[in-house]
Amino acid sequence: MAEIRRYIPGDEDTLSVLLRRTLLEVNAHYCPQGEIEWLYNRYTPESVAQIAADGHTYVMTEGGAIVGTGTVIVTGELECEIIAAFLLPEAIGRGLGTQLFEVLEADEWCEDANRIWLTSSVNALDFYEKRGYVNPCGYRTRGADGLLTMEKRKKR
């Protein structure tokens, strides 16, 4: 079982490499090239550090090596978004995504939210659907922005 901790300054270089590598080696097979290029350019070490400063970023490690990450940000009253949730390609399919999402969804901001949402790549839709996320635009339908949005609403 992997360990999960909060981001510490200095993680940004490794996280940037992880995010970019997974985009190129996994997501590029399923997503439009323009989307991959935009995300690749977005996930510089500097922007990863800024994302961590603005949100609650979690880092998953195995044997001291970083193998995954995800961030929770507040996007509105009683609403949060999970962003930049990625695993290294060799870590996919081993249950680590489930472990990571258990921690992300237990984050205090998610606990307080009525709605948790995220944007998904095509290859991750099954994973999110199994976790109870639905697409508000319709089953596997891209929104007007071209993105696949998934959400989970809590009944209170």
What kind of feature is each model-predicted range?
Residues R115-T119, V134-M150:
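Conserved catalytic-core motifs of GNAT/GCN5-like acyltransferases
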Residues A2-V17:
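A short beta-loop-alpha structural element at the N-terminal edge
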Residues F101, E108-S121:
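Conserved GNAT acetyl-CoA-binding A-motif
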Residues R20-E46:
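Conserved GNAT-fold acetyl-CoA-binding loop/helix
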Residues V74-I83, I92, E111, R142-A144:
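A conserved beta-turn-beta hairpin within the catalytic core of GNAT-like acetyltransferases
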Residues Y43-V59, E81:
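A short helix-loop-beta-strand connector motif used in the catalytic cores of GNAT acetyltransferases and
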Residues L87, G93-A106:
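Conserved acetyl-CoA-binding loop-helix of GNAT-fold acetyltransferases
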Residues V59, A65-I73, E81-F86:
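Conserved beta-strand in the GNAT
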